């Protein structure tokens, strides 16, 4: 397991905690980027006191890979949270990621959202484990 920390221009800290055995696994492109961007733009950048932390983890659990993107930002409005995976929004949002995952990997995979206002948000992405040799 490798853990790295970095400070991005004094705006926030990023912590990566990735199981090294997953470095060679294959996954669809652009699944994590929108999740991390949302954590920064709509989470930690909105903190009145500034700063904040975004933590990205990846672990293998049996035959799945579980990614989490967590922030200690402002959280998501509880009125909006239940609809984020089903309603259209601007950009390449989490609905797009969720639909792409389910279309490619199956309905048992996708995103789960947890959030508390003024505490932060956790987005969990679950996909099947796929070493490079399984994708040809």
Regions inferred by a protein language model and the residue ranges of each:
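Short, small-residue-biased leader/transition segments that mark boundaries at the very start
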Residues: 1-8
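ATP phosphate-binding glycine-rich loop and adjacent ATP-lid/helix-beta elements
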Residues: 5, 28, 38, 82-110
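Conserved catalytic submotifs in the C-terminal HATPase_c
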Residues: 13-23, 116
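Conserved ATP-binding N-box helix of the HATPase_c
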Residues: 29-48
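A short beta-strand-to-loop micro-motif at the C-terminal edge of the catalytic HATPase_c
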Residues: 47-49, 112-120
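Short beta-strand/loop element within the Bergerat-fold HATPase_c
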Residues: 51-63
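Acidic ATP/Mg2+-coordinating residue in the GHKL
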Residues: 71
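A short glycine-centered beta->alpha linker in the GHKL/HATPase_c
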Residues: 75-77
